[in-house]
From Swiss-Prot:
Leader peptide range in chain numbering: none
Organism: Listeria innocua serovar 6a (strain ATCC BAA-680 / CLIP 11262)
Protein name as annotated: Translation initiation factor IF-3
Disulfide bonds: none
Self-association state and partner proteins as the record states: Monomer.
Amino acid sequence: MSKDMLVNDGIRAREVRLIDQDGEQLGVKSKIDALQIAEKANLDLVLVAPTAKPPVARIMDYGKFRFEQQKKDKEARKNQKVIVMKEVRLSPTIDEHDFDTKLRNARKFLEKGDKVKCSIRFKGRAITHKEIGQKVLDRFAKACEDLCTIEQRPKMDGRSMFLVLAPLHEK
């Protein structure tokens, strides 16, 4: 339901299909009759389906309805998890200590629930030995396998090879 719904005198249609506060259809009524019925019940006449023939109007407490709608929207936004992709850059000739540091960072990201993209950039003639980069990425994935699943296997993209790891349980 849109935020700018037509209410009471804002409704331009001459006739509306009327639904009361209990959800029962009262049939096609003139706008004036529908407004009078809504006024007697101390409620608002809200146009819920303006494109229908004739348009559908419902008798309800519009203020309460808007409040409930805002609460639902807020709850939906709160439950929405933003997926963050972190990147760890390696090289085909990475030293053991550097590898361990990068691995520790990646494990920290995975524990937080973030995805990790591990990339290796081949410089100069190193591109001729792609299998070395493949081994480094395989070793990296093997070291993290208790925390993650491999979302995308090692793949070449230009002068880079990358692998995407996703956490086992996203928090």
